[in-house]
Amino acid sequence: DRICTGITSSNSPHVVKTATQGEVNVTGVIPLTTTPTKSHFANLKGTKTRGKLCPKCLNCTDLDVALGRPKCMGTIPSAKASILHEVKPVTSGCFPIMHDRTKXRQLPNLLRGYENIRLSTHNVINAETAPGGPYIVGTSGSCPNVTNGNGFFATMAWAVPKNNNNKTATNPLTVEVPFICTKGEDQITVWGFHSDDETQMVKLYGDSKPQKFTSSANGVTTHYVSQIGGFPNQAEDGGLPQSGRIVVDYMVQKSGKTGTITYQRGILLPQKVWCASGRSKVIKGSLPLIGEADCLHEKYGGLNKSKPYYTGEHAKAIGNCPIWVKTPLKLANGTKYRPPAKLLKER
């Protein structure tokens, strides 16, 4: 008797494409690809995954948390992976913000990209004695604090001239913003300015003309000129009653580097700053996070890796993910197909 290996006959051959012989019939294959179905997003196995910046801050958007809105302040858990669930973050209280004038919408997503995020325990500037003062720190009834009194964002101080002696127009003033974070962290410093109609500008600041503002840090300089009256509606902020508007921006200060802000009337001086370190991988997705998954995929949500490759929609993914391929892949685990002997004789 003779045993021949490598070729056999079968009634159910499979076709595989090979690099050297093109299409070849074989007796058995193992599928290497899967086509996922869309599912909910999940926590990434083996690591901490961040959904909302502050999970315990109820009724707060991520921008509320990033700006330090009263009643929206809490611990931001560390995370190696983060879900970008608000593509266009907005705030829903405190003061109408002219979102599209600056990069303020990007602030929550900037923070989300860090593994460790904390708010400083003390203020970076003494707002009451800053150049152009003395000032009182303005508050808003639409921004209640924890005792339901008038409040404002923890990251900024609304610097209103304290008395008639300094409630006048001023040439540009400059304040240095020191670096107060530690442990090699980046410092994210939030600042801004307030403007109103001409009547309110004179009442608050003694000057009804547009005001100029400049920030500079880490080689990046930004200039603004305030708008006086004629503001757009702020429907996305819930129709807040204030006649004025604020513009909010931020600057990133690297370890040990001082920043500067040059301003006129209506400045929102930086107060508490964000100290952030490490990197968190960010992917677009949705909440809530349900269960765990090997992989987070922007189009399919949470995936468990059942095969090494996948077909379907190609998109960003993080974790232990299958590799995208255009067409299904198969591994031949059988022998090369040989037609039955009877068929060979008929030829």
Swiss-Prot record:
Glycosylation sites noted in the Swiss-Prot or TrEMBL record: N25, N59, N145, N166, N304, N333
Locations listed in the record: Virion membrane; Host apical cell membrane
Other information: Major glycoprotein, comprises over 80% of the envelope proteins present in virus particle. The extent of infection into host organism is determined by HA. Influenza viruses bud from the apical surface of polarized epithelial cells (e.g. bronchial epithelial cells) into lumen of lungs and are therefore usually pneumotropic. The reason is that HA is cleaved by tryptase clara which is restricted to lungs. However, HAs of H5 and H7 pantropic avian viruses subtypes can be cleaved by furin and subtilisin-type enzymes, allowing the virus to grow in other organs than lungs.
Protein name: Hemagglutinin
GO molecular function annotations of the record: host cell surface receptor binding
GO biological process, one term: fusion of virus membrane with host endosome membrane
Superkingdom per UniProt: Viruses
Gene name linked to the record: HA
Cited InterPro entries: Capsid_hemagglutn, Hemagglutn_HA1_a/b_dom_sf, Hemagglutn_influenz_A/B
Family per record: Belongs to the influenza viruses hemagglutinin family.
Purpose of the protein: Binds to sialic acid-containing receptors on the cell surface, bringing about the attachment of the virus particle to the cell. Plays a major role in the determination of host range restriction and virulence. Class I viral fusion protein. Responsible for penetration of the virus into the cell cytoplasm by mediating the fusion of the membrane of the endocytosed virus particle with the endosomal membrane. Low pH in endosomes induce an irreversible conformational change in HA2, releasing the fusion hydrophobic peptide. Several trimers are required to form a competent fusion pore.
Membrane-protein topology: Single-pass type I membrane protein
Oligomer and partners: Homotrimer of disulfide-linked HA1-HA2.
